[in-house]
Structure formats: C-alpha cells, structure tokens
C-alpha cells in the first residue's frame, strides 16, 4: 500500500490556479512582514482564519460566530504567547487541550471541525510568533483586529446564503464527556497528548522552528493505522528529497539572489499546484520553499533544512507511537 502511494501520481488533480494564488499570497505576506512585522502577519492570519471559519447562516448568527471565534482565538493567543518558548510545559498543555477539543469537535459536524482545526493551527503559529512581540496581549489584539476586518467583510456580503448553521463552536460539555468513552474520545486523548509532547520537544529541541514537530503530528496522526503510516512515510520521503533538491540548487545558484527568489516562488507555486497529485511531491516543494526562504533571509539554509528533516522524523515517530497506543487500546477494548 505504501509503495502504491509513493508512485501514484494523479495528474488530473493539478491546480494551476491555486499555485498562482499561492505565489500572490506569498508576495503579499512578504510585503506585510517588511512593512508591519510580526503583528501584521498575526492580523493577516487572523483575518484569513475567521473568513475560513465563516459558515452559511443568517447575518446575525454569522456575526455572533465571528465574535465567538475571535474571542476564543484572542484568549488562545494570549495563553500561547505567554507560554511561548519560555514555558514549554504550559505551551504543551495548551496545545494538548486544543487538539483534544478539535478532535472531539469533528463529531459535531464539519463547521466545528474546521474551526477547531484553525484554532489548533493558530496556537502553533502563536508559539512561533511569540518571540516577535513584547507582550502577549499584542497577539490577542491582533486576532481581534483580524476578526473585526473579517466581520466587516462578512457583513458586506451578508445578503448571500441564509440557511441554518451547523452547530456551536464549543461542543457542549455533555458531548465532551460522552465522547470520552467512545473510540473517538480515546483517540482524541491520544492525539492531544501526542500534540502536547510534540510541542514540548519542538520548543526544547528546535527553538528556531518549534512548530514543525507538532504540525507533522497533526497532519500524520489519523484514526486509521494504514492512513497514518502512509502519510508519515510520504511526508518523510518528501521532506528528505526537498532538503536534498534545495541544497543542490543552492550549491549551483546560491550566489544569485534573484535566481534563489525565483526558485522560492516556483516552489510555492508547485507546492499547491501539485498538492493533490501526490503528498510526497507536496512535501518536497514545501520543504524546498522553506529552505530557500531561510537562504533569502540570510539564515543557514542547510542547517535549517536538516533541522526540518529531524523535526519531521520526530513528528513521525510521535505519530506512529500514537497510532500504536490507539491500536492497542482498541484491541484491549474488543478483547474485553
């Protein structure tokens, strides 16, 4: 099954438009970083996340959802920024709790699942961005600012679809307690603990890139063992090839700044354009883009590439450990 996943290339899934949009977004993000720094990135991410979290419904219900989502995001931003890299235990506990709720929220419908996935990613980003701000409240206000911008955009287009929403952002506590006794609930505990461990080790071992380990765990660890193994192998292979390819390109073009920038933008384009063609190919170009970005920013690209590979391997190991625990738990439950 793994070999088939490695060699399978579904060219019908090429998304050229998505690749071009990604290049545009990369350019905009670079400009925002140059002009506004960390807080500009935080506001931009918050606006994007709130817009993605928007669901069809009456304008009033949608704006209430925006307010709720923005408030939760702001609270998580404060907690994540306060913990940051200086309090890895607290950061890991926060990450574990959010990922647990995100996994449980999947039982509440697609809307709740998407919102909590976005909040999980937001916490990861906050931990990474926290070193760029002086006070935790700054990232909280940035998320509220992004929510305000998104709310204005949603209000402007609010005359569109008017159907029922799919559920609340926060699952009722009765649902949380009920799900704890189900296979999904037990998997949510394992996934949350895995994310917490990944956050702690990421901050401890990769202080410059603490998010890479936990992101690998979030992407790789699935309820199905086969899917977890497949995606873990593909991500490892793609990351390894990405470091190798980018390092080779830098050996040849490293002295030509514009050529490296072009390679960086092309990697971003190919990453999304080929995302659904093959996950290993996606991981290859994602890693290459990150290595080129490190070179452009004046960092040691080879060292950063090796760090990403090691972080990915650690994330894969944690995810595989998580699926072993899940499988053992299900076997024990079935036996009893």
Go through each PLM region and give its residues.
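Alpha-helical transmembrane segments and their membrane-interface boundaries
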Residues: 1-285, 293-336
């Amino acid at each position: 099954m793994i070999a088939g996943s490695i060699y399978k290339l579904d060219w019908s899934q090429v998304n050229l438009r998505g690749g071009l949009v990604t290049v545009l977004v990369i350019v905009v993000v670079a400009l925002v970083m140059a002009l506004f720094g960390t807080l500009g990135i935080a506001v931009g991410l918050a606006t994007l996340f709130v817009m993605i979290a928007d669901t069809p419904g009456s304008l009033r219900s949608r704006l209430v959802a925006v307010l709720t989502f923005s408030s939760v995001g702001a609270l998580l931003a404060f907690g994540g920024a306060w913990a940051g890299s200086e309090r890895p235990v607290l950061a890991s506990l926060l990450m574990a709790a959010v990922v647990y709720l995100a996994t449980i929220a999947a039982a509440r419908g697609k809307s709740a699942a998407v919102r909590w996935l976005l909040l999980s990613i937001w916490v990861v980003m906050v931990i990474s961005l926290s070193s760029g701000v002086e006070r935790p409240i700054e990232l909280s206000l940035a998320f509220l600012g992004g929510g305000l911008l998104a709310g204005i955009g949603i209000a402007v287009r609010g005359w569109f679809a008017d159907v029922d929403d799919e559920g609340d952002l926060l699952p009722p506590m009765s649902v949380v307690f009920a799900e704890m006794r189900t296979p999904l609930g037990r998997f949510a505990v394992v996934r949350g603990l895995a994310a917490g461990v990944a956050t702690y080790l990421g901050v401890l071992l990769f202080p410059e890139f603490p998010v890479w380990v936990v992101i690998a765990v979030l992407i790789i660890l699935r309820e199905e063992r086969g899917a977890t193994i497949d995606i873990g192998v593909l991500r490892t292979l793609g990351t390894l090839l990405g470091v190798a390819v980018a390092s080779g390109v830098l050996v040849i073009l490293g002295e030509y700044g514009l050529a490296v920038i072009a390679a960086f933008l092309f990697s971003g384009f190919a990453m999304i354009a080929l995302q659904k063609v093959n996950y290993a190919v996606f991981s290859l170009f994602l890693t290459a883009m990150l290595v080129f970005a490190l070179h452009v920013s004046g960092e040691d690209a080879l060292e950063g590439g090796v760090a990403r590979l090691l972080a990915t391997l650690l994330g894969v190991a944690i995810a595989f450990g998580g699926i072993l625990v899940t499988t053992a738990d299900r076997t024990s439950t079935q036996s009893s």
